[in-house]
Amino acid sequence: MSVILCTAGYDHTIRFWEALSGICSRTIQHPDSQVNRLCISPDKRFLAAAGHHTVKLYDIKSTNPNPLLTFEGHTGNITGVAFHCEGKWMVTSSEDGTVKIWETRSGQVQRSYNHGCPANDVVIHPNQGEIISCDRQGSVRVWDLAENNCSHQLIPEEDVSVSSVTVASDGSLLCAANNGGNVFVWQLLQAYDRTQLVPVTHFNAHKEYITRILLSPDVKKLATCSADHTARIWEVKDLEPAPDQEPKPFPLEATLTGHQRWVWDCAFSADSAYLVTACSDHYARLWELHSQQIIRQYNGHHRGAVCVALNDYSESAR
């Protein structure tokens, strides 16, 4: 199973798709709640599905419809989930105001960090030593796992909820998006084992909420998904931080139109040439970014598709 593509949402199902044919190859029932986020482990063995209070871990290669493990401990919607590069631990963010680190094998909570207000998303820095999360009061926090504390708190716009964060695969950039439709970009500089954050640019990307922001694996593109029924692709430029001038926005490469409702989530292919989007109109779509064309539509959800996960990395590349 070299390409794993799955979607989920409000019909309480997780669906696996044959990426090229568009055929739904497997459906897992998730009766407890809607599914908010999906994440595939780096070794492609496991799928984490984040729901209302729990994360369920499924064996991708098994036909067993039941989860291997259920991670219990959050008391609100789980909004983000990510795996350590070797799959040893997993991190989650939740509307209960906490970011938790879990041991993947046992399902035990190892650490819990408190935002003090609903947390909307979480990502792991490629150095595996820091996690970055964001919240409804407008802050982005960097948590230093060695020091076991919050090493940075950024507030790009006071009291404007930061909906999503993304960190570059090479650790060079951090981007955040908020409910005002704005994107904020920082350069990440490593100095004496500490990460410094240098503001690079900020710009208005959508007139409505941004639901997801995602850097491509090659760090040349930035995708934003929005309540305005579009996803947009921005060219990541080497912009020198210029404190005296008005920041320049990233150039807009594409506006992906054809969604009928809110676009909630997206995932890049390993070669950064394709994007899959998940939409409230029940469909997931595979886009070829060069032509801005829909290559495939995935039709099967009975309610909104709000999350997507894709892993098409070749085994040899890992």
Residue ranges and their predicted role:
Residues 19-20, 60-63, 104-106, 145-148, ...:
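Short loop/turn segments that connect beta-strands within beta-propeller blades
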Residues 8-11, 49-52, 93-96, 134-137, ...:
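Conserved strand-to-loop turn within each blade of WD40 beta-propeller repeats
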Residues 23-26, 66-69, 110-111, 151-152, ...:
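A structural motif specific to WD40 beta-propellers
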Residues 14-17, 55-59, 99-102, 140-143, ...:
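WD40-repeat beta-propellers
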Residues 1-2, 39-44, 82-87, 123-128, ...:
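Loop/turn segments within WD40 beta-propeller blades
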Residues 29-35, 71-78, 113-119, 155-162, ...:
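WD40/WD-repeat beta-propeller blade N-cap
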